[in-house]
Amino acid sequence: MKFIDEAKITVLAGKGGDGSASFRREKYIPKGGPDGGDGGRGGSVYAVADRNVNTLVEFRYTRIFKAQKGENGRGAQCYGKAGDDLTIRVPVGTVFSDVNSGEVVADLAEDGETVCLAKGGKGGLGNIHFKSSTNRAPRQHTLGEPGEEWELALELKVLADVGLLGMPNAGKSTFIRAVSAARPKVADYPFTTLAPNLGVVRVDSERSFVIADIPGLIEGAAEGAGLGHQFLRHLQRTRLLLHLVDISPRWEAGDPVHEARAIVEELRKYDQALYEKPRWLVLNKLDMVDEGEREAVVAKFVEDYGWNGPVFAISALDGSGCSALTYAVMDYLGMLAPRHEAEDPAPPAS
């Protein structure tokens, strides 16, 4: 299935039913009083977050969602039936925004969370409500109110505790395969990953966290180079970023320090809050460095990069260093307050 993380839809709530203007007419009661019932309310449009829904692809093909209108009132004080509500199911992490104003309408971050997107119109009043001492046979009644109508933009931001950041071919997909059951495509060419991948990293029988791999960034992504920064939104909900850097000795045509800085600069251009998120440095492909030179290579990179935050040297291919990294991540996440209790703390020095 193609991964779709943006869509636009129109939601139309149902119109309320009209009130009835009728009079009681029975045998031996030729001039009975008013007995017109009220119209039923229109159906509303709701959205519910469903963990079994993974993308917004359905909304690329069905763009208009309309709830049922309320039935009109009838004589004998019969009230119209309310219109059926319409519920649409979206992935957990879907954000709804008003297309015209840009205002966020709802952010469904929990499974089962529900929001009313468009409220149904009220039903009209029947003429029974307008009877008075001076008007014994009112013909007045009211029409049902129209339901709300909105044009909404949907944006999916995947929910993960940890996000992977890095250049294409930095080994992010290999890493997520090494530490979780996720099986993203891995190949020796750039942009193998074309959509976000999620993996659950279980460090023991009781503790686990979710990690997200997004397509790699390159310098100029903010201006649309490569795949652009269209997938960076999926890192906004994470609590920690792992910046993977390829330190294998294949840099005749490039400088890993420059490229690492370029990635962080793209992050800053996209979103200052994302740039300030806690970030750890992960130096990957250690298996391609001579064993006797590894410590010196790591130390030189850290010095040249000017990094004084947490740093881990790993090989995603053979798994060395991965266990220590995942345990450190789990311990760090365990020290943070749950998502619903506190915001992320200040990032470590970088």
UniProtKB/Swiss-Prot annotation:
GTP binds at residues 166-173, 191-195, 213-216, 284-287, 315-317. Residues 17-43 are annotated as: Disordered. Keywords: Cytoplasm, GTP-binding, Hydrolase, Magnesium, Metal-binding, Nucleotide-binding. Its main location: cytoplasm. Residues 1-159 form the Obg domain. It is an enzyme of class 3 (hydrolase). One of its GO terms (cellular component) is cytoplasm. It is found in: Cytoplasm. Residues 33-43 have a biased composition (Gly residues). One of its GO terms (molecular function) is magnesium ion binding. The keyword Nucleotide-binding applies. The keyword Hydrolase applies. InterPro entries: G_OBG, GTP-bd, GTP-bd_Obg/CgtA, GTP1-OBG_CS, GTP1_OBG_dom, GTP1_OBG_dom_sf, OBG_GTPase, P-loop_NTPase. Its cofactor is Mg(2+). Mg(2+) binds at residues 173, 193. GO terms for biological process: ribosome biogenesis. Disulfide bonds: none annotated. Its EC number is 3.6.5.-. Residues 160-334 form the OBG-type G domain. Belongs to the TRAFAC class OBG-HflX-like GTPase superfamily. OBG GTPase family. Monomer. An essential GTPase which binds GTP, GDP and possibly (p)ppGpp with moderate affinity, with high nucleotide exchange rates and a fairly low GTP hydrolysis rate. Plays a role in control of the cell cycle, stress response, ribosome biogenesis and in those bacteria that undergo differentiation, in morphogenesis control. This is GTPase Obg. It comes from Thiobacillus denitrificans (strain ATCC 25259 / T1). The gene is obg.
